[in-house]
Amino acid sequence: MHPLPGYWSCYCLLLLFSLGVQGSLGAPSAAPEQVHLSYPGEPGSMTVTWTTWVPTRSEVQFGLQPSGPLPLRAQGTFVPFVDGGILRRKLYIHRVTLRKLLPGVQYVYRCGSAQGWSRRFRFRALKNGAHWSPRLAVFGDLGADNPKAVPRLRRDTQQGMYDAVLHVGDFAYNLDQDNARVGDRFMRLIEPVAASLPYMTCPGNHEERYNFSNYKARFSMPGDNEGLWYSWDLGPAHIISFSTEVYFFLHYGRHLVQRQFRWLESDLQKANKNRAARPWIITMGHRPMYCSNADLDDCTRHESKVRKGLQGKLYGLEDLFYKYGVDLQLWAHEHSYERLWPIYNYQVFNGSREMPYTNPRGPVHIITGSAGCEERLTPFAVFPRPWSAVRVKEYGYTRLHILNGTHIHIQQVSDDQDGKIVDDVWVVRPLFGRRMYL
């Protein structure tokens, strides 16, 4: 008996659906993809992370020569990650940490196993110690669709302009979207940058789904808090990454607010004891304390949760960061660029009228969330606030040059104006007496 006319079409659709669970038509692939680097916080090291669709060994082959054999080997581990979407797609996330790297030396590497290898990538090992001048690309809110900053970031990376990337929350829009296929597409998109530079992150609100599981699984940050909060040293700076999202998604546990706050205070105390060696303290968190955008986001409220804490009094971060003399606070979330005057409790504390950022008496805030995503740019309120110094409603990203222990150079690159520098400022602070704002 012949099957009904619709039988074969239904069968084919079911077959395609089942194959799609692994992310591609055909047999699941053992070839590495979504390759990216991170700095594990240990001098002379670098972590390589990648994805396969079947379990394989986790190995990195590396060396100094761009062609020919790669004589050095490092092994690691993989963990299966099951996305929380309806298809329960399974990815295998591999991590290998390379150690005893020569500072400032360029390495060539590939990752994978006998079942399949990635192409060759290059990276330059971070220099050790405090006496060098790191250059970073800084941005947030970069999506798989409308990723305006990516082509220029790729060119910058190929030209060796940066030592690391700081992605200040909100990835892909969203990593979990379409049963995490959008996350896969995004990780492939950033590979030309992230496979060559340590790509350091913090979580944003768009990572929240399934308790931030895609963010925690896909990125490999230092520490033992699943990349939600951690710190690391880079040249003359101590960089602290933290989660603003613990203040908003309380159903995952109010205890996380307290845990992070206590960790932050402990880390800031240690950073201040080490201030002679690492004079700059820089923080990165997704949702800003302040902004002058024309929306109803938390940063537009006088008693914002990030600034003042839960119920306006519990675990607020502005007093904490001011107490321990944080120099520079990096934010995103608003799809625009805004630089504030040195500020504390809505009061401007410029160093002087002529040189406001020389020995400022309050932290400097930079909001850089215009790298490009499907939600487009965020407009500003018609009238700037008294504490707002520069506002740019254009796609772009920030360049941060930590020149030495006293000087930081900040520039905003406009993709709308073909790479034009639309903001340029130096922050200057003395080597001594850095903890307290006077």
UniProtKB/Swiss-Prot annotation:
<dbReference type="InterPro" id="IPR029052">
    <property type="entry name" value="Metallo-depent_PP-like"/>
</dbReference>
<dbReference type="GO" id="GO:0046872">
    <property type="term" value="F:metal ion binding"/>
</dbReference>
<dbReference type="Pfam" id="PF00149">
    <property type="entry name" value="Metallophos"/>
</dbReference>
<feature type="binding site">
    <location>
        <position position="286"/>
    </location>
    <ligand>
        <name>Zn(2+)</name>
    </ligand>
</feature>
<dbReference type="Pfam" id="PF16656">
    <property type="entry name" value="Pur_ac_phosph_N"/>
</dbReference>
<keyword id="KW-0964">Secreted</keyword>
<feature type="binding site">
    <location>
        <position position="333"/>
    </location>
    <ligand>
        <name>Zn(2+)</name>
    </ligand>
</feature>
<keyword id="KW-0479">Metal-binding</keyword>
<dbReference type="InterPro" id="IPR015914">
    <property type="entry name" value="Purple_acid_Pase_N"/>
</dbReference>
<comment type="similarity">
    <text>Belongs to the metallophosphoesterase superfamily. Purple acid phosphatase family.</text>
</comment>
<feature type="glycosylation site" description="N-linked (GlcNAc...) asparagine">
    <location>
        <position position="211"/>
    </location>
</feature>
<feature type="binding site">
    <location>
        <position position="141"/>
    </location>
    <ligand>
        <name>Fe cation</name>
    </ligand>
</feature>
<dbReference type="GO" id="GO:0005576">
    <property type="term" value="C:extracellular region"/>
</dbReference>
<dbReference type="Pfam" id="PF14008">
    <property type="entry name" value="Metallophos_C"/>
</dbReference>
<protein>
    <recommendedName>
        <fullName>Acid phosphatase type 7</fullName>
        <ecNumber>3.1.3.2</ecNumber>
    </recommendedName>
</protein>
<feature type="binding site">
    <location>
        <position position="205"/>
    </location>
    <ligand>
        <name>Zn(2+)</name>
    </ligand>
</feature>
<dbReference type="InterPro" id="IPR041792">
    <property type="entry name" value="MPP_PAP"/>
</dbReference>
<keyword id="KW-0325">Glycoprotein</keyword>
<dbReference type="InterPro" id="IPR025733">
    <property type="entry name" value="Purple_acid_PPase_C_dom"/>
</dbReference>
<keyword id="KW-0862">Zinc</keyword>
<dbReference type="InterPro" id="IPR004843">
    <property type="entry name" value="Calcineurin-like_PHP_ApaH"/>
</dbReference>
<dbReference type="GO" id="GO:0003993">
    <property type="term" value="F:acid phosphatase activity"/>
</dbReference>
<keyword id="KW-0408">Iron</keyword>
<dbReference type="InterPro" id="IPR008963">
    <property type="entry name" value="Purple_acid_Pase-like_N"/>
</dbReference>
<feature type="binding site">
    <location>
        <position position="335"/>
    </location>
    <ligand>
        <name>Fe cation</name>
    </ligand>
</feature>
<feature type="signal peptide">
    <location>
        <begin position="1"/>
        <end position="26"/>
    </location>
</feature>
<feature type="binding site">
    <location>
        <position position="170"/>
    </location>
    <ligand>
        <name>Fe cation</name>
    </ligand>
</feature>
<feature type="glycosylation site" description="N-linked (GlcNAc...) asparagine">
    <location>
        <position position="404"/>
    </location>
</feature>
<feature type="glycosylation site" description="N-linked (GlcNAc...) asparagine">
    <location>
        <position position="350"/>
    </location>
</feature>
<feature type="binding site">
    <location>
        <position position="170"/>
    </location>
    <ligand>
        <name>Zn(2+)</name>
    </ligand>
</feature>
<keyword id="KW-0378">Hydrolase</keyword>
<keyword id="KW-0732">Signal</keyword>
<feature type="binding site">
    <location>
        <position position="173"/>
    </location>
    <ligand>
        <name>Fe cation</name>
    </ligand>
</feature>
